[in-house]
Curated annotation (Swiss-Prot):
The lineage of its organism: Bacteria, Pseudomonadati, Spirochaetota, Spirochaetia, Leptospirales. One of its GO terms (cellular component) is plasma membrane. HAMAP family: NDH1_NuoI (MF_01351). [4Fe-4S] cluster 2 binds at residues 88, 124, 127, 130. InterPro entries: 4Fe4S_Fe-S-bd (IPR017896), 4Fe4S_Fe_S_CS (IPR017900), NADH_quinone_OxRdtase_chainI (IPR010226). This is NADH-quinone oxidoreductase subunit I. It comes from Leptospira biflexa serovar Patoc (strain Patoc 1 / ATCC 23582 / Paris). The keyword Repeat applies. Binds 2 [4Fe-4S] clusters per subunit. Belongs to the complex I 23 kDa subunit family. One of its GO terms (molecular function) is quinone binding. Its cofactor is [4Fe-4S] cluster.
């Protein structure tokens, strides 16, 4: 067997003087800090909002808390088709379906309804895919952004907490 010549192709990168001492990165960070300092100190631009006293203004396109809408007759729009659950990239939605009985027929437009509908806000990334996937327009991400909670159980939204009140405004389309 013959010998094999091995060639080492790895090169060591030679850092320049400012890369060696990280002056460039430190200077960029200090420049950003100095810009914020000048805005706040000399131009009186507030960065922080005093939350309980002042409320933040949200855009009309803001995706906030989840809500479930009713149709024009006050019935639940959700028909437990599982589209929102399947499309959720964070697996934050859990639905259990049930058949509509004769005594509940006035509450649901279809033959199937969501017996249990939960959204785990600890997992939700508020991407809005559930809203886009819903063929009935049952789930919306409305503009309310106050989601502070004292315990983990408050961050699990149930159907009862999300459902629009009977006789409330019917929101059909997002502007």
């Amino acid at each position: 067997m013959g010998t094999v010549n091995v060639v080492n192709v790895a090169k060591k990168h030679q850092f320049s003087w400012y890369e060696k001492f990280y002056f460039w990165s430190i200077g960029k960070g200090l420049w950003i800090t100095l810009k914020h300092f000048v805005k706040v100190a000399f131009f009186n631009k507030q960065v922080t909002i005093e939350y309980p006293d002042k409320k933040r203004q949200y855009s009309t396109r803001f995706r906030g808390m989840h809500s479930m809408k009713r149709d024009e007759q006050g019935r639940e729009r959700c028909t437990a088709c599982f589209c929102c659950m399947w499309i959720c990239p964070a697996n934050a939605i859990h639905i259990e379906a049930a058949e509509v009985t004769a005594e509940r027929q006035h509450l649901h437009p279809e033959d199937k309804y969501a017996k249990k509908f939960e959204i785990n806000l600890l997992r939700c990334i508020f991407c809005g895919l559930c809203e886009e996937a819903c063929p009935k327009g049952a789930i919306y991400l409305d503009g309310t952004g106050e989601m502070a909670a004292d315990n983990r159980e408050d961050l699990f939204l149930t159907k009862e907490r999300m459902m629009e009140k009977t006789g409330g405004p019917i929101l059909g389309q997002r502007n």
